[in-house]
Amino acid sequence: MAQVAGKKLTVAPEAAKPPGIPGSSSAVKEIPEILVDPRTRRRYLRGRFLGKGGFAKCYEITDLESREVFAGKIVPKTMLLKPHQKDKMTMEIAIQRSLDHRHVVGFHGFFEDNDFVYVVLELCRRRSLLELHKRRKAVTEPEARYYLKQTISGCQYLHSNRVIHRDLKLGNLFLNDEMEVKIGDFGLATKVEYDGERKKTLCGTPNYIAPEVLGKKGHSFEVDIWSIGCIMYTLLVGKPPFETSCLKETYMRIKKNEYSIPKHINPVAAALIQKMLRSDPTSRPTIDDLLNDEFFTSGYIPSRLPTTCLTVPPRFSIAPSTIDQSLRKPLTAINKGQDSPLVEKQVAPAKEEEMQQPEFTEPADCYLSEMLQQLTCLNAVKPSERALIRQEEAEDPASIPIFWISKWVDYSDKYGLGYQLCDNSVGVLFNDSTRLIMYNDGDSLQYIERNNTESYLNVRSYPTTLTKKITLLKYFRNYMSEHLLKAGANTTPREGDELARLPFLRTWFRTRSAIILHLSNGTVQINFFQDHTKIILCPLMAAVSYIDEKREFRTYKLSLIQEFGCCKELASRLRYARTMVEKLQSSKSAVAHVKASA
């Protein structure tokens, strides 16, 4: 019987009944709404669905006594019938419960009933670096340093405790509300029992698999260094080093060490990647060597990052800040194209190469072509006409948008369109195609000129040429506070907020039945007037969020809707969306208010 530190994992005998026989628990049991730990008598309320992976489903769970919120990983015992499955689960729990580090997902206990095993973990609300990567592709060098430093710190702790993670990848590097990295998912992890032990077997396929694992030569801590090399490459280049469309070809490239680093990558960064991706595991740096590399010692590492970095690049003003904030002049960013990290005129970052233009640039149509293609493919399969529709299987909460428009007011006959984002920041797209945004602190401002050049100011210090626009912005903000929203107190500024950049409203138009809004991060939102339903489309995540008449907010992957189908209501809105995206794309000037009627 599998055992975790004196506590057995039991699988009820009836779970082994063959399928199709009445009473067989091979039919998936309903997960209870209240989860009870029989040992401590703690009770948890099962809340929002967070996602699924492997055998497990993950939910937000709330301790009914302390009101603390956790992530509950729930595994049906029907999936733990074979000894190796049970042993794997036992090992995962045993390893994770032995760990306690700032950059490792916190373990808060586990328990079971007849049907499920429940693991109580730290909740990471900002998902993982995988979603960030899908939205951002390549990140700026200071951001890469920030995420890598924390990942290495967590991995140092694992290695010092003789744990090899064996599946370090973007999807297993989770982010909390403070944008701190937490290493999670110890399903493939193992413990080194004695010095020099080489592990021979590995159940499962790691994402960034090292050549010595493929060669079955025995492996150890060096596999995690290889994975960190792949992570660093992916963060800076925007795609994994050995990626091909065919797994066999990818493995061949790994074995041959066949990859190339684009010329625009800083040579210091390229050198560190090359060291970590050496075929010979003994010639790779150890985890303790990494943070002493020039890449980390010579470059700027932000102490905090704003959550806006999940979808748009940050602005780097001063590293570290030495100027009294009250004396700072408004900072104006040099416009280098929308996807380049913004350089501010006042102070340059530590290294010139940090600001080099990424190899790819954001498409001129802001991902409308991709969205059109995605919607065309989806609508072609007629998802609401399937014989069996299982819309809930298409749900993917990890793809939930970072920003959407929560309120808007149309004054375009005189001034422009005012709107509020879900984080309570407020913006106006003026009729002259300029934009002004006030952050949710009620003080910071972002001004975007017609040519997309961005400037950063505050309500206490701005050029007189902007006086009228700032007065109008405040008017819009007050109007929406009084008439359209629950007035909320200003949020307290936190460290890292000075690096925030918000997506802005790129273009919009109204039809008889809806308003269509296109944000600069690629998101398209359609609000339907009659029933107040909304859809929010993200081409980078290839996902749609649907807010129905009951104001329930659910996010689906478009590819999974193709596979599992969807209700007629969502299908008709997705057909309408395709027509609207086509209209957005064909408008000659997709940077302001498009006149339309449909």
Swiss-Prot record:
Changing residue 201 to V: Abolishes activity. Residues 404-482, 504-586 form the POLO box domain. Its EC number is 2.7.11.21. GO terms for molecular function: ATP binding; microtubule binding; protein kinase binding; protein serine kinase activity; protein serine/threonine kinase activity. Induction: By growth-stimulating agents. The active site is at residue 167. It is found in: Nucleus; Cytoplasm, Cytoskeleton, Microtubule organizing center, Centrosome; Cytoplasm, Cytoskeleton, Spindle; Midbody. Disulfide bonds: none annotated. Serine/threonine-protein kinase that performs several important functions throughout M phase of the cell cycle, including the regulation of centrosome maturation and spindle assembly, the removal of cohesins from chromosome arms, the inactivation of anaphase-promoting complex/cyclosome (APC/C) inhibitors, and the regulation of mitotic exit and cytokinesis. Polo-like kinase proteins act by binding and phosphorylating proteins that are already phosphorylated on a specific motif recognized by the POLO box domains. Phosphorylates cdc25, pkmyt1/myt1, stag2/sa2, tpx2. Belongs to the protein kinase superfamily. Ser/Thr protein kinase family. This is Serine/threonine-protein kinase PLK1.
